[in-house]
A protein has these predicted regions:
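N-terminal accessory targeting/assembly segments
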Residues: 41-45
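Conserved SAM/SAH cofactor-binding pocket of Class I
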Residues: 147-200
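Non-catalytic substrate-recognition/targeting regions of SAM-dependent transferases
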Residues: 48-64, 70-137, 144
Length: 200
């Protein structure tokens, strides 16, 4: 029976200073008679200076996005630990999930839009529906990985980025030297990606 290889990018929420975290798990075969070890490699998005998960509790996470603190729901936060970090009381934005689905933002001295930097890339952030800000910071682990692959390819590289959202991967691939085609079904997201490209 073959081993399972899973590549999972995650943020520093669980592991603060690790580059790779190896987790061994037991894999039970379809006959439930043979147990095998499965190796999961998690790459940590540890290159951020302007983003961090500060704390998690009661189904929510407290994050720093540049100079601003946001509280957003996270279904993976299943523990009920005390909220001792003062950021919980000094947040700039809080996304409240509705029991009917969706939710809405509540703002406290938060600009309509601001910039966030990752290495030499610049992103324009603005909170919008479904708790989003226009960026998935944990994906920086992938940006670094394929950026290295592109730079070391020794040949011209073309990248087709589908469902490209606001262009984080597009900008990272282009910065590494690739020729990138950015595609997304949402005209608004494509426009936002163009703003990010202009800022970078």
């Amino acid at each position: 029976m073959a081993f399972l290889w899973i590549h999972v990018p995650i943020s520093r929420i669980w592991y603060s200073n690790l580059r790779k975290c190896y987790i061994k798990m037991l894999y039970i075969s379809y006959k439930f008679t043979i147990m095998k070890e499965v190796l999961i490699i998690m790459w940590i998005a540890d290159g951020w200076k302007e983003y961090e998960v500060i704390d998690t509790s009661k189904g929510e996470k407290l994050e720093r996005w540049g100079d601003y603190l946001l509280v957003r729901p996270d279904p993976q936060v299943i523990w009920d630990t005390p909220r001792k970090n003062r950021g919980w009381k000094h947040m700039n934005g809080h996304y409240h999930r509705s029991s009917r689905g969706g939710g809405e933002w509540e703002f406290f001295d938060l600009p309509h839009q601001w910039e966030l930097h990752y290495k030499d890339l610049t992103f324009n952030l603005k909170p919008f529906s479904f708790k989003h800000t226009g960026l998935f910071p944990e994906q920086a682990a992938n940006w670094d990985w394929f950026g290295d692959k592109i730079r070391n390819a020794g040949r011209p590289v073309k990248v087709l980025n589908l469902f490209a959202y606001t262009g984080g991967a597009t900008l990272a691939a282009a910065r590494a030297g690739a020729s990138v085609t950015h595609a997304d079904a949402s005209k608004g997201m494509v426009g936002w990606a163009k703003e990010n490209a202009a800022s970078s």
